[in-house]
Amino acid sequence: MPYAVLGATGNCGTALIQNLLQSSTSKVHAYCRDRRKLLYLLPHLADNKQVDIFDGSIHDLPLITECVRNCHAVFLVISTNDNVPQCRMALDTATAVIQALRILHGEGASMPKLVLLSSATLDDQLSQNTAPWVRWILLKSASQVYQDLSQAEAFLRQQQDWISTIFIKPGGLSVDVQRGHRLSLTEEKSPLSYLDLAAAMIEAADDPDGRYDLRNVGVAYTDGPARFPRGAPMCIFMGLVRHFLPFLHPYLPATGPNQGFLC
């Protein structure tokens, strides 16, 4: 069963590939900008017949079309930990995928399910256990990223008459081992490991009843939290600087992705 992972070199992308390859029947279409980087992160992919790598620009429509062709689900996980001014990663990815799917739809192909990685911070229900002042800080520290995600979500919801999307919204994320997860429509529990997040995204995509289609879906850990992402404080601080003083962005350090971050 083919799955496309757009953003294969990120923490979530590599975790998705690792989880998917646990099944001998899974086929992975891994999209990235840099094949060498992906093979550096996951060297065993070089001779893995379950994986096809598609490297190039997200604006390369023929490339993206072939990447998502015949897929059961497409995971949209291209993002950044940095509060980049005028960030468009999520919206550009969603737009490229929809353009590709329109071509395939015109050919009579069956449509995949889309799974967008978003954030619990954007959802009042899923953020119910987050202190208001903490949520305010998070919203400001990733304001550009969240605006991009909100626009991508709105765009994908406009396609709901012909494409189903699941909006996965975790809380804090950390590079850690897999501990177990639980999908929820009412809460998130974090910090959560990327491996648990990836397993949750696959479970939601594979749900035979479509219970998570067009829903905001939280993820909770089930066997204890992941370790606290040590890069989170610096990520948040630099995000606040970029929010209030965006002209400083070119001079500020990157804060990820390997350190983990808070969504």
Swiss-Prot record:
Q: Where is the signal peptide?
A: none
Alphabetical keyword list? Monooxygenase, Oxidoreductase
- Family of this protein: Belongs to the avfA family.
What is the tissue specificity? Answer: Specifically expressed in conidia.
Its pathway, per UniProt, is:
Secondary metabolite biosynthesis
The answer to whether keyword Oxidoreductase applies is yes
| Example of a GO MF term | monooxygenase activity
Q: What Pfam families has UniProt attached to this entry?
A: NAD_binding_10 (PF13460)
Q: What is this protein called?
A: Oxidoreductase tpcG
Q: Which PANTHER family match?
A: FLAVIN REDUCTASE-RELATED, OXIDOREDUCTASE MDPK
Lineage at the top is:
Eukaryota, Fungi, Dikarya, Ascomycota, Pezizomycotina
EC number, as in UniProt: 1.-.-.-
Could you state one GO biological process linked to this protein? secondary metabolite biosynthetic process
Annotated source species: Aspergillus fumigatus (strain ATCC MYA-4609 / CBS 101355 / FGSC A1100 / Af293) (Neosartorya fumigata)
Q: What function does this protein fulfil?
A: Oxidoreductase; part of the gene cluster that mediates the biosynthesis of trypacidin, a mycotoxin with antiprotozoal activity and that plays a role in the infection process. The pathway begins with the synthesis of atrochrysone thioester by the polyketide synthase (PKS) tpcC. The atrochrysone carboxyl ACP thioesterase tpcB then breaks the thioester bond and releases the atrochrysone carboxylic acid from tpcC. The decarboxylase tpcK converts atrochrysone carboxylic acid to atrochrysone which is further reduced into emodin anthrone.
